[in-house]
Amino acid sequence: MRTKSLKKNRINVVTLGCSKNVYDSEVLMGQLKASGKDVVHEQEGNIVVINTCGFINNAKEESINTILEYVQKKEDGEVDKVFVTGCLSERYKPDLLKEIPNVDEYFGTTELPGLLKALGADYKHELIGERLTTTPKNYAYLKIAEGCDRPCSFCAIPLMRGKHKSTPIEAIIIEAEKLAAKGVKELILIAQDLTYYGLDLYKKRNLAELLEALVKVEGIEWIRLHYAFPTGFPMDVLDVMNREPKICNYLDIPLQHISDSILKSMRRGTTKEKTTKLLKDFRVAVPNMTIRTTLIVGYPGETEEDYQILKEWVKEMRFERLGCFTYSHEENTHAYNLEDDVPEDVKQERANEIMELQSQISWELNQEKIGKIFKVVIDRKEGNYFVGRTEFDSPDVDNEVLIDASKKYVKTGEFTTVKITEAADFDLYAEVVS
């Protein structure tokens, strides 16, 4: 029998979804630690906080299943309390209260002070940048804005995250300096829309100015850009990328589709011609830039012709990095008023075809790297290999560089120089040269 009065509470934060959720969990954990709480990330704890995702169906299912798993553990006496926060809770709180009432309390995306109070902690305004990072020690996510003002028809993010709100440059720099002091060498800048940064605060797109301030932070060696938007992209960012070696020649810019009829229905504010020109301008401005994009197939009304236009365009553009997802019909979005008329098996078949095509493109591009020298950062040791990345690869989603651990010891979290000896579609094999 438990003697709860003698037991010290341990808070386990479970994170689901995207890098923005990772960041939010780290902020929560930093606040809890500052209040003297024993807090862990995805380990054993008698109090559980689940930071959920509510973006698409698969993510919602994972979040619901995780909630049910911990509610069952609560009923079995394995945990004492279960709290739920994040996007699913923001979007569906009334439904969740009705369907899963055994959760102790639900909190939305803007209710951090309330969540902390429920956990017996105080919200401290002065804790700018005091996060408890959960990523490997060499990199960290740095959120520069919250929310989104774009009207994309398929996307529920504005419902869960609200309007775009930029973080002041001064606050971002303070956070970056604190991360660097902890040994972080790579900053991955994230937002729903990086290209909008500054419009609300400074009345102009200010991403380039932010980058120029960040490169001055001592200890930071790489700065990576995630989640740009093709409309209104501030081209002065490319000037900074060319000029400053700390800015990775890498851009994650989700393009979603390329058929003009689908782009119009998606309310993306661009066309195939404009998008293609933008990408070609990127290539001219930064010749060795790696472009990552994501695509959606099976959007309402997507015909075989629309799909073939997309497929041929992927062949033409030869993206270095690409992900493809099937359309998810989301309540309260503009596209929800359209008929979800592409069968699920057709959606999946199209997504598989795009990824098979990308696998071949990636293999061909990787063959060109054999014999070349790259600076890599070592993220971890896994089995018989040290696993690293070049500046052209983001954690978890891109290529990895594998170094035979039996031949050379390299320190995790550090940079080293390697020569590529072999290449697969999404992996590079290398030997250390210095």
Where are these regions (language model features)?
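Conserved, mostly hydrophobic/aromatic
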Residues: 172, 189, 225, 253, ...
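Proteins enriched for Cys/Gly/acidic motifs involved in redox and nucleic-acid/cofactor modification
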Residues: 1-197, 236, 247, 251, ...
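Short, electropositive alpha-helical surface patch
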Residues: 202-215, 235-249, 302-320, 344-349, ...
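Short strand-connecting beta-turns/loops that link adjacent beta-strands
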Residues: 44, 149, 258, 381-383, ...
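Conserved strand-turn element in the central/C-terminal portion of the radical SAM core barrel
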Residues: 16, 151, 155-162, 222-231, ...
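Radical SAM/AdoMet-radical enzyme domain recognition
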Residues: 181, 208-209, 216-223, 234-295
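Terminal RNA-binding accessory module
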Residues: 337-434
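Conserved glycine-rich "GG(E/T)P / GGGxP" loop and the immediately following alpha-helix
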Residues: 54-59, 184-209, 213, 217, ...
